[in-house]
């Protein structure tokens, strides 16, 4: 058997998250079904699992296939079976584990105050936010190593809540005629819905609805003020570092 590394992008609006679902509407379901159609029976490992509605620009996968499959041949037959909502960007033979060998994961979140067309609604979140300075002040609180027990949703197999945030910042830009704030958070790994809870806390602070002290108390597991994640549609798994 050969081990392959696949880099994919997918439109999270068409799936119920990355993980396999009882109704077969997970990204993993689609990929494993496509592989099965080619006679390849292999579990597919992802660098990170994304929730319902969350997108990926560069998700990384590892799986095994029989030795008669070369990377070029497999790309040729697999890519059309994943389209149009999953795009196979790159495929190479590599002996590695997509999840355990990953060193960092980078997420981006797109938020605008005024969405001018419904056709971008699945891809840019729409909601109010305060000044960029306040957003970045809040984001800085999360850098470093923390126990993120109060910044996660229930579920998932992870038992260790400690994670490292290497960098977290926000900036403004224009995307298809929309002024957006873009959040970028880079960490070693993330708990379930942790990125969206972090961004929600920062947005609420920028709107002066919560204090910096309340964010710090939640980081230190003293009191949970933010319990509801920000909407999923603006979030992208942007890059995985190995």
Swiss-Prot record:
Entry EC no(s): 5.4.99.12
GO molecular function: RNA binding; tRNA pseudouridine(38-40) synthase activity
Pfam families according to UniProt: PseudoU_synth_1 (PF01416)
InterPro entries on file: PsdUridine_synth_cat_dom_sf, PsdUridine_synth_TruA, PsdUridine_synth_TruA_a/b_dom, PsdUridine_synth_TruA_C, TruA/RsuA/RluB/E/F_N
Residues holding substrate: 107
Keywords: Isomerase, tRNA processing
One record GO biological process: tRNA pseudouridine synthesis
Superkingdom, taxonomy of origin: Bacteria
Quaternary organization: Homodimer.
Family: Belongs to the tRNA pseudouridine synthase TruA family.
Listed name of the protein: tRNA pseudouridine synthase A
Organism: Helicobacter pylori (strain P12)
């Amino acid at each position: 058997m050969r081990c392959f590394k696949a880099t994919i992008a997918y439109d999270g609006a068409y799936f119920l998250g990355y993980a396999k679902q009882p109704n077969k509407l997970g990204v993993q379901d689609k990929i494993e079904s496509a592989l099965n159609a080619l006679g390849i029976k292999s579990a597919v490992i992802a660098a990170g699992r994304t929730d319902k509605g969350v997108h990926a620009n560069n998700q990384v996968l590892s799986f095994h296939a029989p030795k008669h499959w070369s990377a070029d041949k497999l790309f040729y037959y697999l890519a059309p079976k994943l389209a149009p909502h999953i795009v196979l960007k790159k495929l190479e033979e590599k002996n590695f584990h997509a999840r355990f060998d990953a060193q960092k994961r980078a997420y981006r979140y797109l938020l605008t105050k005024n969405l001018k067309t419904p056709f971008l609604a699945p891809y840019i979140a729409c909601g109010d936010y305060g000044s960029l300075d306040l957003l970045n002040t809040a984001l800085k609180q999360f850098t470093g190593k923390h126990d993120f027990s109060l910044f996660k949703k229930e579920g998932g197999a992870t038992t260790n809540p400690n994670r490292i945030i290497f960098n977290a910042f926000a900036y403004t830009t224009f995307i298809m005629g929309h002024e957006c704030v873009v959040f970028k958070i880079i960490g070693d790994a993330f708990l379930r819905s942790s990125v969206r809870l972090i961004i929600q806390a920062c947005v609420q602070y920028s709107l002066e609805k919560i204090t910096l002290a309340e964010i710090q108390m939640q980081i230190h597991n003293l009191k949970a003020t933010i319990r509801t994640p920000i909407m999923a549609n603006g979030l992208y798994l942007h890059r995985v570092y190995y």
